[in-house]
Amino acid sequence: MPDLAHVIREISEEMAQRSDRGAVADYIPELARVDPDQFGMAVIDAEGQVFTGGDSETPFSIQSVSKVFTLTLALGMVGDRLWKRVGREPSGNPFNSIVQLERERGVPRNPFINAGAIAVTDVILSGHEPREALGEILRFMQFLAQDSGIIIDETVAASEKRTGFRNTALANYMKSFGVIDNPVDYTLGVYFHHCAIAMNCRQLARAGRFLAHNGVNPSTGHSVVSAERARRINAIMLTCGHYDGSGEFAYRVGLPGKSGVGGSILAIAPGKASIAVWSPGLDAAGNSHLGRIALERLTQRMGWSVFGA
């Protein structure tokens, strides 16, 4: 088995030398200001050892990576009844597509596209005030990462709200079909805020560990979800975690993963490691360009693909 610390150091150096970095998300003004010349990586192995490279301690907006954790929470609240409100199939369309939602009568294709994540957020909000629902999401993230210092970047949340016209359209369209129960403004407020949670690579990798270990957070021994549910969340991450780039990610990386337009990717090597990478420059599908390349090299060198070494 190759030395993991050496592999991560090697990959970080390779990423620092690349000139093709993608383009930062410019439709959220606060994200457009992020320096694209950054790359960070953290891997936590089965024994709990942490290996890092590059800008692994720099906080970033996790954006759609939060959808893994809101899905986990919603499933804990309502179980498989959630799947009456959202599907489990890849979309093959941009993450904020309105056309697909219209064709499918307001039921989002999966919980990781924007419409699906808004519907999942609405489930968490039901029976709560928005502040309470958001607090529950944030505390869950802090608990998983074992770090009470994780915060919501209010500036990013406000920036998303000011420019979130497409998400508002998606939410209103779902509301017209009865998929959204709560006031649209309340649901979107919680959604924009949980996407604006700020974490670094080390924190994000720690938060994802339960998905690498049959639903158990090995740091605490706490069972977050059942082994079956962990496998199913990983399956949705593999098939739907990178929007219309999910097939390419599965082909090249071969791990369950979830990306965010802030440039981060959480990837899971079941039984082996939880991995977080971050580089703000995105590819055409809205996924971290260097993040995907780094993960491809990591799985190749460590033999971690779920499809075989």
From Swiss-Prot:
Substrate binds at residues 64, 114, 160, 167, 191, 243, 261. It catalyses: L-glutamine + H2O = L-glutamate + NH4(+). Signal peptide: none annotated. Its EC number is 3.5.1.2. The keyword Hydrolase applies. It comes from the Bacteria. GO terms for molecular function: glutaminase activity. GO terms for biological process: glutamate biosynthetic process; glutamine catabolic process. It is an enzyme of class 3 (hydrolase). Belongs to the glutaminase family. PANTHER family: GLUTAMINASE. Homotetramer. This is Glutaminase. The lineage of its organism: Bacteria, Pseudomonadati, Pseudomonadota, Alphaproteobacteria, Hyphomicrobiales.
